[in-house]
Swiss-Prot record:
Protein name per UniProt: Putative membrane protein insertion efficiency factor
Membrane disposition: Peripheral membrane protein
Keyword Cell inner membrane: yes
Family annotation (InterPro entries): Membr_insert_effic_factor_YidD
Organism of derivation: Thermus thermophilus (strain ATCC 27634 / DSM 579 / HB8)
Length: 82
């Protein structure tokens, strides 16, 4: 499942993202954040983090540096295994 989600994000980045202006308020961008979250935390928690991030990316949020958490959920030892 994680691989399918990663392919969808890569499709978005390759074909859809160039058609619109750069509007992401965060670093890394929301799509880069989603890829890293999926690779680090697997399909379920990575998707959860990515959706939360996209919902925060709006004109009323100041944005800024927002890295993917190393441990998520708190106390999780390793990422990627589901």
């Amino acid at each position: 499942m994680r691989e399918v989600l990663i392919l969808l994000i890569r499709f978005y980045r390759r074909f859809l993202s160039p058609l619109k202006p750069r509007t992401c308020r965060f670093h890394p961008t929301c799509s880069a954040y989603a890829l890293e979250a999926l690779e680090r935390h697997g399909a379920f928690w990575g998707s959860y983090l990515a959706v939360r991030r996209v919902l925060r990316c709006h004109p009323w949020n100041p944005g800024g540096l927002d890295p993917v958490p190393v441990l998520f959920p708190p106390g999780k030892v390793r990422g990627g295994a589901e």
